[in-house]
Amino acid sequence: MEECCGTEGYGDFKAKKPGNREKPDVLLYDDPDNILAMKGISMKTYKPEVSFSQANRGSLETYVEELGISYGVAETLRAFVIKNHGGERTMLNEAPVSEQDELLNFFRLYQRQIVSHVLRGKAKAVLKADWLMLHETRDADWIKKVGNRQFWHLYPMAKVIDCCCSEEPSITKAGNLTLGLGMTLQRKGGDGGAKTANDLQFKLNPKIIHEQLSKA
């Protein structure tokens, strides 16, 4: 409470889960009518030995609209997520060099806005995630240890975004996109062949983020 709201003790603050699809998982507030003063927290539970957890996902069309993705970049991503008549996808490292360059230029130019969209929420959203709480699950009894300070790490989202943007976007050897430090973009897959398997999925590496920010 002291870190998020700048106050000692709980005072009149309460916590609730947003009744919408906004980015925060938990809202802290002392005045239920003052929405703009609410502090949003995004929470990620992770196993240190597991590299990535989902940060955001949606259809290509949704991201084209929300992120202003250009036509050329959108077509490269379309070939990346949707199989052709032969059942094949074009991994990003298999796309023509000119298309790879266009895609990388776009994500480099708008890296911070995109990372913020993924982690903090839509630019026009009223409720945003102001903080990121990472909770380590080291054994089967992790739920009982949620309140143990040893296992959770709280960081201002602005610092998390800075951390991710400390590394430039690049295409991996596997043909996915590294959007920044600890963040990747890939095809969701799975879902029994449903259309949602073609969604774009942003994944975050909580371990890397924690290791970098804990040094600061």
Regions found by a protein language model. Give the residues of each.
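Short, positively charged
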Residues: M1-P24, L28-A216
